[in-house]
Structures are given as C-alpha cells and as structure tokens.
C-alpha cells in the first residue's frame, strides 16, 4: 500500500483539535487519550510533537496570542502610548472573549510561548520607547495583563440569574433590577471594561509626567 503523501499528524492538527475541545468543553476535556481519539491516531504518536498535555495547552494559548493585534505599537508615534495601549487592550480582550476557557493558561504569563513573548516585547518596547523607565514599563505590562485577563475570566452581568424572585427587596433593596443584567451581558461587560480601561489609562497619563524620560529632547507631557 502506498504511503500517505502527508504525515497523518502534525503540531498544527493537534493544536487545532485541542483548541476546538477547549472552546467547546473547557480545559478538563483535553487529554492525550481524548485528542488521539479525535484525531484518529494512537496516543503515543502525540508525543512525537509534544512532551505532555501542558505543552499542548501552551500551544493552544499561543494560538490565541497570535490573534492579538500589535500593529498599533509599530505604527504609532512613541508619545501616543496611551491610545496604543487602549487599542491593544481591546484587541487582546476580544481574543480572550472568543476563547474564554484558555484564559487561565494565558493568565500564568507567556513562559516560553513565542507569540506571548512577542506581545510582552511589543508592550515593553512601546512603553520604554515613549519614555517610561524600564521598571515602570514592566509594572504597566503587569497591570495591563492583570486587568485584561481578569476581565476575561468571568462575566459580571452573567453572574446574576434571570429570576426576579432571587432578589427579594427585603434582603437586597438595591438589586431590584439585577435579574435583567443577564439579558444585557455583552453591553454591561464591554461597557465596564471600557470604563475601567479609560480610568486606568487616565491614571497612567497623570503619572507619565513624573516618570517619563523625554524621547526627543522636549519636556515630557502627560
């Protein structure tokens, strides 16, 4: 019998199958046995491409990081750091919102993941390029990751049930409309993220004049 022209298995195929499982069923659904069954191969064959399940999940996480737009850091003037961070944060959150089950893996940090490291490098480079001292640029990167991944770990509006009787006014006098939140989940959650992001960036802009080193010989401005 003729040998197949292409290998039956590849890293991309494994990552694609694992990503689909994570998206549909969550992290616990991923195992080498389950992946092998989905891919129609033997379990040990996966180890020709990945050492263990954690490496597979890292690759799934990195595939999400690839979706984050970094062009604003390459195209913007260094002094436009605030708007660049804003646009990047929206892109990052959109990528996480599309794949919420992988967020706990991404929240651990980039580790050795190439795409994740490119994100960290782009943010740090943009901040130091705008005049932020390296130590403060590091803190900004950490702050943004905490804020973005934290917002993607769960829905505030989705945490309230669509049942008016759950919020007895005798017990919760200020939650009379809480049962309506679930129907407006996207509006509430995206609005909250934008409000928090603007407040965060406004605060950084105030600090900018205190910390930043001029990038062009002129006084730094907030």
Report each predicted region and the residues it spans:
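Actinobacteria-biased recognition of intrinsically disordered, low-complexity terminal regions
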Residues: 1-8, 12, 74, 209-222
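Helix-turn-helix
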Residues: 13, 17, 21-59
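Amphipathic alpha-helical interaction segments
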Residues: 13, 55, 87, 118, ...
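Short, basic, alpha-helical segments at the C-terminal edge of helix-turn-helix-like DNA-binding modules
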Residues: 63-68
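C-terminal peripheral helix-coil segments that are non-catalytic and often amphipathic
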Residues: 157-222
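Hydrophobic alpha-helical connector segments
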Residues: 70-115, 134, 144
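Hydrophobic alpha-helical bundle segments that form small-molecule/ligand-binding pockets
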Residues: 117-169, 182, 204-207
């Amino acid at each position: 019998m003729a040998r197949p022209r292409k290998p039956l298995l590849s890293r991309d195929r494994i990552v694609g199958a694992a990503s689909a499982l994570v998206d549909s069923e969550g992290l616990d659904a991923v195992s080498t046995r389950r992946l092998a069954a989905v891919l129609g191969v033997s379990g040990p064959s996966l180890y020709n491409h990945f050492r263990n399940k954690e490496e597979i999940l890292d690759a799934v996480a990195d595939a999400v990081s690839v979706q984050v737009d970094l062009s604003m850091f390459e195209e913007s003037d260094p002094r436009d750091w605030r708007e660049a961070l804003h646009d990047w944060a929206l892109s990052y959150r959109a990528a996480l919102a599309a794949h919420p089950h992988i967020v706990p893996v991404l929240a651990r940090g980039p580790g050795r993941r190439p795409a994740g490291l490119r994100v960290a490098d782009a943010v740090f480079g943009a901040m130091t390029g705008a005049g932020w001292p390296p130590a403060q640029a590091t803190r900004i990167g950490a702050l943004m990751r905490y804020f973005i991944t934290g917002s993607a770990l769960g829905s505030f509006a989705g945490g309230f049930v669509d049942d008016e009787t759950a919020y007895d006014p005798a017990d919760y006098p200020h939650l009379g409309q809480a049962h309506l939140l679930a129907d407006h989940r996207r509006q509430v959650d995206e609005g909250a993220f934008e409000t928090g992001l603007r407040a965060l960036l406004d605060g950084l802009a105030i600090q900018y004049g205190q910390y930043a080193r001029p990038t062009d010989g002129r006084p730094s401005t907030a």
